[in-house]
Amino acid sequence: MGYRSDVAYVIKFNDIETRDNFVTLMLAKNDAQLTQAINECEYGYTKDPIITFEATDVKWYSDFDDVKAHHALMHDAVEIYKEKGGKYRFISIGEDGAEECDEDDDDGDLYDYITTRHEINTAFPHIPTEDSTLTTQE
């Protein structure tokens, strides 16, 4: 079975043209893993120059080729397009609740796109008051 995580990241550029050029450049590398990673992302946003990725309940090990490709996208965005706004924010939450955050986002601009929130949701059945074992102290 193995340890599973929920992961998400956002890559942002200064403008749509730069984002689209980045996607074209990554696809032009003819690297099967990079192509698969790009195809797993959303980048058709018409008003926001971002690339997004989200996966739940996945095995996200740093030595897996697909994981390396996703991290390469984030790092290449900064390495190649830093002067054109290339930056990213990555967050994963493991099945044990452990969080990992990696980012190159000096101004905190990407925080609005991706954050974490731990919460407990319950669906306890309703107990009629007369059957309740709850006692109050006076």
Labelled PLM ranges:
Residues M1-L27:
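Short, extreme N-terminal segment that most often corresponds to the first beta-strand
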Residues V23-E138:
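Charged interaction segments
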